[in-house]
Amino acid sequence: MKVSAALLCLLLTAAILTTQVPAQPDALSALFTCCFTFNNKKIPLQRLESYRITSSHCPRKAVIFSTKLAKAICADPKEKWVQDYVKHLDQRTQTPKT
């Protein structure tokens, strides 16, 4: 009886672990989204919601802008317009809303 209870416990633990493992690679890939090409066109500033910088694990440093329609757009951080947009978005998030 004790052996069958221990076996059942072991099987349940294994089942729980195997259902959780496939979700981990997706979570990791979301953390390490890399850009391999850049958007060459200037994006209208009013369409942008936020930005983030790519991980240091990526081959190219990039800014990823998120639009209000939930699209991700890669941009070259060396471009002047990208730097201006980053400053503007930083100021927008620091300004308290009344």
Swiss-Prot record:
Residues 1-23 form the signal peptide. Disulfide bonds join C34-C58, C35-C74. CDD domains: Chemokine_CC. Keywords: Chemotaxis, Cytokine, Disulfide bond, Inflammatory response, Pyrrolidone carboxylic acid, Secreted, Signal. GO terms for cellular component: extracellular space. GO terms for molecular function: chemokine activity. Belongs to the intercrine beta (chemokine CC) family. It is found in: Secreted. The keyword Metal-binding does not apply. This is C-C motif chemokine 13. The modification Pyrrolidone carboxylic acid is found at Q24. One of its GO terms (biological process) is regulation of cell shape. Chemotactic factor that attracts monocytes, lymphocytes, basophils and eosinophils, but not neutrophils. Signals through CCR2B and CCR3 receptors. SUPFAM superfamilies: Interleukin 8-like chemokines. InterPro entries: Chemokine_b/g/d (IPR039809), Chemokine_CC_CS (IPR000827), Chemokine_IL8-like_dom (IPR001811), Interleukin_8-like_sf (IPR036048). It comes from the Eukaryota. Pfam families: IL8 (PF00048). Transmembrane segments: none annotated.
